[in-house]
Amino acid sequence: MLFDKYDVNSVEVHDPGMVKYINVKSALNLHTGGRFSSYYAGKINMNVVERLINKLMRTEKWTGKKYSAYKITKDAFDIIADKTKQNPLQILINAIENAGPREEVTRLKYGGIAVPKSVDVSPSRRVDEALRNIATGATNASFKSKKSIVNCLADEIMLAAKNDASSFAISKKEEIERVAQSAR
């Protein structure tokens, strides 16, 4: 059970490449305290909701305020459950699958000249990029706005789950993939 409300056993990841990297195991406390940071690829052992909470703490306003980010995420999940009548964890996983870019651009140097080259994105990076863009989209939408960050996070997750281009995460993914397409 997540937040003592949502069943984690009914959730499934549809993207076969991301199954290993999206952890939805039930946890009493979504605060590992960096327990997995010393392990290689230890973040795959962290619950994906805790990773979203950690991504929400990126800006100056939210630095170190994990309980505030926890409450924001919990309230956003309640809003998602009320609006969609579905498990909000499944909606979040669908949003992560849709918002993760499949290819991006890296820079190669040939004789002192930097040339962009299109490369495939690893599944771990896809999850990281998706979570970061969802959290960034929510904080950007709530900045200097009457909408609270709770509503903005819920909207961002629902729009990304629907693969809607008005979502910040989806628009960033499409921009990255468009640049990669031109660099082939």
From Swiss-Prot:
Indicate the transmembrane segments per the record: none
GO MF term set: rRNA binding; structural constituent of ribosome
**Record's GO cellular component terms:** small ribosomal subunit
What's an example Gene Ontology biological process for this entry? translation
- Alphabetical list of InterPro entries matching this protein: Ribosomal_uS7 (IPR000235), Ribosomal_uS7_arc (IPR026018), Ribosomal_uS7_dom (IPR023798), Ribosomal_uS7_dom_sf (IPR036823), Ribosomal_uS7_euk/arc (IPR005716)
**Is the keyword tRNA-binding in the record?**
no
Record has Transferase as a keyword? no
Q: Which CDD domains match?
A: uS7_Eukaryote
**Protein keywords:** Ribonucleoprotein, Ribosomal protein, RNA-binding, rRNA-binding
Q: How does it assemble?
A: Part of the 30S ribosomal subunit.
Please give the family membership noted in the entry.
Answer: Belongs to the universal ribosomal protein uS7 family.
What biological function has been recorded for the protein in this entry? One of the primary rRNA binding proteins, it binds directly to 16S rRNA where it nucleates assembly of the head domain of the 30S subunit. Is located at the subunit interface close to the decoding center.
**Which protein are we looking at?**
Small ribosomal subunit protein uS7
* Gene name for this UniProt entry: rps7
